[in-house]
Swiss-Prot record:
Name listed for the protein in its UniProt record: Maltose/maltodextrin import ATP-binding protein MalK
Enzyme class per UniProt: translocase
Gene encoding the protein: malK
Function description: Part of the ABC transporter complex MalEFGK involved in maltose/maltodextrin import. Responsible for energy coupling to the transport system.
Species, as recorded: Vibrio cholerae serotype O1 (strain ATCC 39315 / El Tor Inaba N16961)
Listed InterPro entries: AAA+_ATPase (IPR003593), ABC_transporter-like_ATP-bd (IPR003439), ABC_transporter-like_CS (IPR017871), ABC_transpr_MalK-like (IPR015855), ABC_transpr_MalK/UgpC-like (IPR047641), Mo/tungstate-bd_C_term_dom (IPR008995), NA-bd_OB-fold (IPR012340), P-loop_NTPase (IPR027417)
Keywords noted in UniProt: ATP-binding, Cell inner membrane, Cell membrane, Membrane, Nucleotide-binding, Sugar transport, Translocase, Transport
EC annotation from Swiss-Prot or TrEMBL: 7.5.2.1
UniProt domain ABC transporter: residue ranges: 4-234
Chain sites annotated for binding ATP: 36-43
Membrane topology field: Peripheral membrane protein
């Protein structure tokens, strides 16, 4: 195990800056997920840590050693790619031991490591088979096993589940999480899927256009996003946003006016808010409530209803507004397309964002997570 530290790291291809002034500390044994949309620089950053890409400026440390100029093979990292990259003519044992054989490791040591990795990954009964005889999930476990036998200080995984179907992705993400907990290893995992990030990580790093937008525990990012980008990216379905007018401001609350004229107070830090300002109110679909239980009411025409059995998702167009809202309830709702529906907004679950995307600090304490300072 080893820690990983990035200090003001930048990566450019010619004049195009991909990773921008990244400062990050990853502790020994921590499971960290880099997440963000396509093109945000998450895989590039991972490849810089692995040594597959040169760092343009800044410093990378693994443990106490500066790694900028150290060869990839000497960094003590193991990488699992999106592609399994297995040798089709070799059986599982030979695929997993290939790197150790190249390094001329002792045969008994090779067997010991491969057998141990196969036992952990539940592949012991498949070691004599070739990759073509395996399922996608089994092939991915072999790719992980090949990295595991090298006993790296840091595991790097670049979207390893992208080639799997939905059901297998759910199974494999739990297996990878259990493996990381069992080994206690430092693991950095790249994905564009925020559900993977929320369910697997000790700490999430959200990247936006090469910048680190926010770093924190999953529930910190969910309940206390620092900006509108993180608020909209974390959570599924994504957060609802609607334009509001600021009617009143106090130190620990802000009064907003909705497009339908309704006003109510939101418990957020008001020290950065100006009366008369236009801001953006955010509320998650699962935090909307029945009309009688809200501090404010909104009405809209039902456009789409998704009845999933365990929950219902209703897509609405708000009356007197161009805004669309998603309403999510853990039950089957008696509502159909074309209906008019009135729902409630609970003030303590609201988020408030400035025009530049900065969030006002929420003052409501959510369960399972500390209030940000």
């Amino acid at each position: 195990m080893a820690s990983v530290t990035l200090k003001n790291v930048c990566k450019a291809y010619g004049d195009v800056l991909i990773s921008k002034n990244v400062d990050l500390e990853i502790q020994e044994g921590e499971f960290v997920v880099f997440v963000g949309p396509s093109g945000c620089g998450k895989s590039t950053l991972l490849r810089c840590i692995a040594g597959l890409e040169d760092i343009t400026s800044g410093d990378l440390y693994i443990g106490e050693q500066r790694m900028n100029d150290v060869e990839p093979s000497k960094r003590g990292v193991g990488m699992v790619f999106q592609s399994y990259a297995l040798y089709p003519h070799l059986n599982l044992y030979d695929n997993m031991s290939f790197g150790l054989k190249l390094s001329k490791a002792d045969k008994s040591e090779i067997k010991k490591r491969v057998d141990h990795a196969a036992e952990i990954l539940q592949l012991s009964h498949l070691l004599d088979r070739q990759p073509k005889a395996l399922s996608g999930g089994q092939r991915q476990r072999v790719a992980i096993g090949r990295t595991l036998v090298s006993q790296p200080n840091v595991f790097l995984l670049d979207e390893p589940l992208s080639n799997l179907d939905a059901a297998l992705r759910v199974q494999m993400r739990s297996e990878i999480t259990k493996l990381q907990r069992k080994l206690g290893c430092t693991m950095i995992y790249v994905t564009h899927d925020q559900v993977e990030a929320m369910t697997m990580a000790d700490k999430i790093v959200v990247l936006d256009a090469g910048f680190v937008s926010q770093v924190g525990k999953p529930l910190e990012l969910y309940h206390y996003p620092q900006n509108r980008f993180v608020a909209g990216f974390i959570g599924s379905p994504k957060m609802n946003f609607m334009s509001v007018f600021i009617e009143g401001v106090e130190k620990d609350r802000v009064q907003v006016q909705l497009s339908n004229g309704t006003t109510f107070w939101i418990p957020v830090d008001g020290t950065t808010v100006t009366r008369g300002e236009r801001m953006s109110l955010g509320i998650r679909p699962e935090h909307l409530v029945e009309a009688e239980h809200g501090d404010a009411k909104i009405e809209g025409k039902v456009m789409i209803v998704e009845k999933l059995g365990n929950e219902t998702q209703v897509y609405m167009n708000l009356k007197g507004s161009d805004s669309d809202v998603i309403y999510r309830q853990p039950d089957t709702l008696d509502v159909e397309t074309g209906d008019t529906l009135t729902i409630g907004i609970p003030a303590h679950r609201c988020h408030l964002f400035h025009s530049d995307g900065r969030a006002c600090r929420r003052l409501h304490k959510e369960k399972g997570v500390d209030l940000p300072a």
